Amino acid sequence: MRAAFERFGLLINDRIVRTPVGIASMAGIVDADYVLERAGHIGIAFIGGYSIDRPTMTAAKTLAAGGDRKEFLYDDPVKELKTQIAKMETSDVVLGINLRGSSPDSFSALARALGNTVVYEIDAHCRQPAMVEAGCGEYYLNHTDRLVAVVRALKETGVTVSVKFRIGVAPDDRTLAVALWKAGADILHIDLMDAGSAKLRQIRNSCPLLIIANNSITNFDRMREMLSHGADLVSIARQSDERTLAGLDAAITRFADEEGWYNSPKQLCRGGDIRALCFCCMPVKECPLIPTLERIGLPREDYIRMKLESVRGTPLEHGNQTCFGSLAWCCKISSPCMFRNMTLKQYGISTKEYMRLKRDLSETIMSRVFP
């Protein structure tokens, strides 16, 4: 697992995530047994959705009785979830439980009963009328004060919190992301529908939370598109067969081992997200850097100072012969530059190590932009 951490640098719930490929919940289908059959190709899995109080358990029975959907049915959600969690104890897959509840107290009571060994995912995604009428799923996206209250209630119990939601339902997804971040959420699990990478980039530029991109990400090109626009992981639900998962796992592992930064953003001038500031030069000409700094409220002088301070004492401090005297201002390795490459060769810095150092710089930048 140490090799996985060096490769991807992913920690969730204080556990190393082996690969940025995950399984998303599907009611009545994704349980511990489903996950264990695919465990060799994933780093995280969200089982569920599990209804956890009387209104949502009644809604689940209504949906199951309709015959069109599978649901997990039980009389005691705590007992059921303890059984599922116990099955996963020896697995290195980070476990999340996708939960349908109608009140903050329902979530916090469950967290106190189960403890902090799992990620608690609030289901703000389900759009089935019975669930929405019960006060969960997409209900929360139109009543964000209630969703924020659930996040806060869970965080008061000391657990890791994810929120699963569908893009384009809330009045403003960026405002929602900021509200969830401020409330204490740790993860945004986003069903992008047909919104594409531009919407993902907007959310990445709104908050520092770990982002899992979901929906039809079944090939490496699609996966890279999501990762290069702000996602930290991707998840699959209906198409989470072993072959698809294995293919994504192998491809991203190979890419990371070759490139050094598995989810490196596109450069800012090519549509990259805010992390791409690590590739930007001095703010001396009219380009996308200037409006980006203005939008995030970062004066040019502070931007210059921040980058220089961040690379002090690191190999990125070198580069007298580069355009601006330091590798801090140099572009992505995929962009040709003989001055950058001369510096890398002079100081024995591999292209892979260069990209890892740029990843470290981007993390510092994100922590400064989103304190």
List the model feature ranges, each with a label.
Residues 1-103, 323-370:
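N-terminal capping/small domains of soluble enzymes
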Residues 31-39, 104-116, 170-182, 207, ...:
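Catalytic cores of alpha/beta
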Residues 38, 56-68, 132, 200-206, ...:
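C-terminal helical cap(s) of enzyme catalytic domains, especially alpha/beta-barrels
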Residues 45-55, 119-130, 186-197, 229-251:
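Glycine-rich phosphate-binding active-site loops on the catalytic face of alpha/beta enzymes
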Residues 72-76, 98, 120-125, 137-146, ...:
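Catalytic beta/alpha-barrel core
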